[in-house]
Amino acid sequence: MDPDFWHERWRQKQTGFHQTQVNPLLETFWPRCVGPARPRVFVPLCGKSLDMVWLRNRGHSVLGNELSPIAVDEFFRENGLSAVTTPLGNGFVRAESGDISLLCGNYFDLTPDLIGKVGAIYDRAALVAMPPEMQGRYAEQVFRLLPETPPMLLITLEYDAEEMSGPPFPVPEEAVVRLFGPAYRIELLSARDALEGNPQLRAKGLSRLTEKAYWLRAQASA
């Protein structure tokens, strides 16, 4: 997607993709999958997600990446957090408050040195924000940034693409396997009907919407 598209969505407050509550799949499956460990978590295309506050409250250090400075500013302001901002060059600004740090800039311009060491990935809104022709590039960037392939909780949507043009875009299970299967063991945790909770998508003509959660773990070395 063109960056200007997302900048305009935030300027016009067309942010129906923002969830006003913590994602229930995160609440259900993160403790079960991660256990007592408290790894540093990378949240790509994080927006102003409350999920990051939930992760922080569980003892994680959180690193988010977001294109829109409006989203970054609103995240800290709406959660009563005072952030320190630092220009990093290459078009990035870091905004930091305690254990939450957001890198404001284009995901595809991120470099491993900006990310640092990460112990887990949480993707609720990144892959589904990419049209199918960009999803491979998104996954390649994950591997480039984090070659150690930390575990990932991935949440996707499935629907008939003929009924609606995204975003959000459908990511069928076979696409998850194609994109991440070479490096990860993929476990389907949940598949639930999500149409009732997304009236704005029903209004666009969707007759079916399935939200799926996957737990991805690195393939065992030969």
From Swiss-Prot:
SUPFAM superfamilies: S-adenosyl-L-methionine-dependent methyltransferases. It catalyses: S-adenosyl-L-methionine + a thiopurine = S-adenosyl-L-homocysteine + a thiopurine S-methylether. GO terms for cellular component: cytoplasm. InterPro entries: SAM-dependent_MTases_sf, Thiopur_S-MeTfrase_Se/Te_detox, Thiopurine_S-MeTrfase, TPMT. GO terms for molecular function: thiopurine S-methyltransferase activity. GO terms for biological process: methylation; response to metal ion. It holds the Pfam family TPMT. Keywords: Cytoplasm, Methyltransferase, S-adenosyl-L-methionine, Transferase. It is found in: Cytoplasm. Its EC number is 2.1.1.67. The keyword Glycosyltransferase does not apply. S-adenosyl-L-methionine binds at W10, L45, E66, R124. It is an enzyme of class 2 (transferase). Belongs to the class I-like SAM-binding methyltransferase superfamily. TPMT family. HAMAP family: Thiopur_methtran (MF_00812). This is Thiopurine S-methyltransferase. It comes from Methylococcus capsulatus (strain ATCC 33009 / NCIMB 11132 / Bath).
